Design a protein with these regions (language model features):
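Left-handed beta-helix
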Residues: 70, 75-76, 81-82, 87-96, ...
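Short glycine-enriched, charge-decorated loop/helix-capping segments at active-site entrances
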Residues: 46, 120-121
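Residue-level signal for alpha-helical context at structural boundaries
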Residues: 29, 33, 64-65, 98, ...
Length: 193
């Protein structure tokens, strides 16, 4: 009985997360039937469970079906925490060894991509880690085995190839970071780079 109860609890949590992040949502029913980001996460959970149990081909086929239906590609090997939300998710790509903590939010067009290292074999971590509470703006590309620290924000269209410490604002091409508190204070004062 624990399985179905846990499943219903997670679905409710996902819907509540979508409502909290999207002020345009009108109802839980609307989210349940019409939010592709939520559907992609649900499909990933099934594919990831199959992947972990060794049903790799079935998991990959399911992930490609999920991609076809939602426009969001999440490799079944990716590890994703709770309360993950993808807003307007078309074009999101999450690679095989990506790790996402709890309360992560991605906008459309985000790529969590790999960088192959010469001589690295199968199973080598080559995709980013996003710690808890990270938000990634539309079109951002985070590439390679790097870590974006807890509570950080990655700006739209940033190209990130280096680690960012917790509570950073990460912007630009190539991306630079600074403490999020400093960036927030500058914005309040009307100071721009």
């Amino acid at each position: 009985m624990d399985g179905p109860v846990k499943l219903v609890s997670r679905v409710r949590e996902d819907i509540a997360t979508a409502r909290a992040h999207d002020p345009a949502s009108r109802s839980a029913l609307e989210i349940f039937v019409a939010y592709s980001g939520v559907h992609a996460v649900w499909g990933h959970r099934v594919a990831h469970a199959l992947w972990r149990r060794g049903f790799r081909l079935v998991a990959r086929v399911l992930s490609q079906l999920n991609r076809f239906l939602t426009g969001i590609e999440i490799h079944p090997g990716a590890t994703i925490g709770r309360r993950f939300f993808i807003d307007h998710g078309m074009g999101v790509v999450i690679g095989e060894t990506a790790v996402l903590g709890d309360d992560v939010m991605l906008y459309h067009g985000v790529t969590l991509g790999g960088k192959a290292r010469r001589g690295a074999g199968r199973g080598t971590k080559r995709h980013p880690t996003l710690e808890d509470g990270v938000t990634v703006g539309a079109g951002a590309k985070i590439l390679g085995d790097i870590t974006i620290g807890t509570g950080s924000t990655v700006g739209a269209n940033a190209v990130v190839t280096h680690d960012a410490p917790p509570h950073s604002l990460v912007v630009g091409v190539p991306a630079q970071f600074r403490p999020l508190a400093d960036a927030t204070a500058d914005a309040a004062r009307g100071v721009h780079d």
